[in-house]
Amino acid sequence: MERVTLRIPKQQIEEVERMVETGEFPNRSEAIRSAVRDMLNEQVTDKRQRESTSKRGWAKV
């Protein structure tokens, strides 16, 4: 696993900390990994939907 260093606004990291404290995630790293996974999955889904829509055409009569 690669290490990545990033800056996150204080308000957002405080929200991540609350999620860890309430047991939603075991630690901050896992919370951030989960957010990245969700974002990537959403991007892939959106791309597939756009590709599917662009392949549709008018029915030949």
UniProtKB/Swiss-Prot annotation:
Database matches in InterPro entries: Arc_rbn_hlx_hlx (IPR013321), CopG (IPR002145), Ribbon_hlx_hlx (IPR010985)
Pfam family name, one: RHH_1
Cellular localization per UniProt: Cytoplasm
Keywords, in A-Z order: Cell cycle, Cell division, Cytoplasm, DNA-binding, Transcription, Transcription regulation
Cited function: Transcriptional regulator which plays a central role in the regulation of cell division. Controls expression of the gene encoding the cell division protein FtsZ1, and of genes linked to other metabolic and regulatory processes, including synthesis of signaling molecules and protein degradation. Acts by binding to the promoter region upstream of the target genes. Is probably part of a regulatory network that controls the cell division apparatus and other downstream gene products in response to several conditions or stresses and via other transcription regulators.
Family to which this protein belongs: Belongs to the CdrS family.
Name listed for the protein in its UniProt record: Transcriptional regulator CdrS
